[in-house]
Amino acid sequence: MEEKWKLSKKDTTASSSSSKSKFSRSFSTSASSTKSPIFVRSSSTKCSVPSSSSSSSSSSSISRSFSRKERRSSSSSSSSITQKYSSLAKEQKARFYIMRRCVAMLVCWHKHGDS
């Protein structure tokens, strides 16, 4: 795919007054007929992370806790709130422990790699 840089008409008049020139990028699609199917990008492909993974993001734990809350009855007792926050605290503590161990390992490798 060829890339061509062109000055737009708006930016041509503005570039005479300023020191920076603004460029717009245009692509020619002449090579699109010879594309291999390997290079074609599919927008329907999604990457999924299993929920049991220890490296899942905090947003997934929040969405999981909300889905648990929706499955429960509409009555919000103090024990369910306590249970929810204690499970979130345990999960966060486990993530912090894993992250701390990883950082310690990287620091150790950095120190011993220099000698």
From Swiss-Prot:
Q: Where is this region: Required for DVL/RTFL small polypeptide activity?
A: 80-111
Note the superkingdom of the native organism: Eukaryota
InterPro entries in the cross-refs: DVL, DVL_RTFL_polypeptides
**Protein's recorded name:** Small polypeptide DEVIL 13
Q: Which UniProt keywords apply?
A: Cell membrane, Developmental protein, Membrane, Transmembrane, Transmembrane helix
GO BP annotations of the record are: negative regulation of cell population proliferation; shoot system development
Q: What gene does the UniProt entry assign to this protein?
A: DVL13
Positions of transmembrane segments = 44-63
The record's family statement is: Belongs to the DVL/RTFL small polypeptides family.
